[in-house]
């Protein structure tokens, strides 16, 4: 069994996203098995077909400035979230900032580990102080998260949950492949990192389709060092005729759940027949 892969506190990488039907999951798994191994979380989720739960609580300003920047296609923007894995009942939890760098596909990711006794007091207690036991990089990332949280007056907005099968390359310095399925969301105004009720399944024709109905309901993401896309990744894209597509779980969930059922930003043939109330 592989050891847990620990992401560095700051990671700058190139991210490629594709929408695929669930039927592609196993063939793609077979293809990349020559170059990749399951990550620790997937390897320990054999009973669930190597899919594990990812729970993310997304934050935004009171007037949704992060979302507005995303919709406007602003080149330099940030996304802030707290994340936990599995059932979310125990730490570690993670604070994450994803910063778009002005270059298509290039993302800088800041991450800090949060202990049980720190959550959610680090965001709700004005007297909270970062522990001296944190490493210098962890401390710097927590301080950055808190500065942005205070200056933007961030609030919990959306909780998402999905099942992920993840891989890491065994032949490259850094390549990570993830496939996210069974995605759910709910509006959230507190700091709970998981929910057992009120989660809405992503509706296929509303969420995933582009201008028409689609069988795509899984998000495939390939992450690698900038300027180092391996040949096997290009072969994967060509073999399965994958088309790169932007997809934001936060933006999609928020638009559909908060803004007129998403009608104002979707073309008429993408409107859902289902209720998102």
What are these language model-derived features?
Residues 1-277:
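Phosphate-end processing signature that detects enzymes handling 5′-triphosphorylated RNA
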């Amino acid at each position: 069994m592989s050891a847990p892969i620990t992401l560095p506190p700051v990671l700058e990488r190139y991210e490629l996203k594709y929408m695929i039907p669930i039927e592609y999951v196993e063939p793609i798994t077979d293809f990349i098995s020559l170059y990749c191994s399951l990550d620790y979380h997937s390897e320990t989720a054999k009973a669930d077909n190597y899919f594990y739960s990812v729970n993310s609580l997304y934050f935004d300003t009171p007037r949704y400035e992060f979302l507005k920047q995303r919709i406007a296609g602003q080149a330099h923007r940030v996304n802030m979230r707290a994340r936990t894995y599995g059932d979310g009942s125990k730490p570690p939890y993670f604070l994450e900032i994803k910063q778009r760098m002005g270059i298509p596909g290039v993302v800088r990711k800041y991450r800090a580990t949060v202990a049980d006794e720190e959550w959610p007091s680090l965001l709700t207690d004005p007297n909270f102080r970062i522990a001296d036991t944190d490493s210098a990089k962890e401390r710097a990332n927590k301080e950055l998260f808190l500065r942005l949280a205070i200056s933007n007056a961030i609030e919990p907005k959306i909780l998402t949950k999905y099942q992920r099968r993840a891989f890491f390359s065994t032949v490259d310095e850094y390549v990570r492949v993830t496939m996210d399925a069974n995605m759910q969301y709910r509006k959230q105004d507190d700091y709970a990192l998981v929910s057992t009720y009120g989660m809405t399944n992503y509706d296929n024709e509303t969420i995933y389709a582009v201008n028409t109905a689609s069988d795509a309901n899984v998000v495939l993401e390939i992450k690698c060092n900038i300027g180092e896309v391996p040949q096997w990744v290009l072969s994967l894209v060509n073999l399965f005729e994958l088309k790169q597509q932007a997809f934001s779980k936060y933006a999609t969930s928020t638009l559909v759940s908060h803004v007129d059922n998403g009608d104002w930003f979707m073309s008429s043939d993408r409107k859902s027949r289902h209720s998102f109330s």
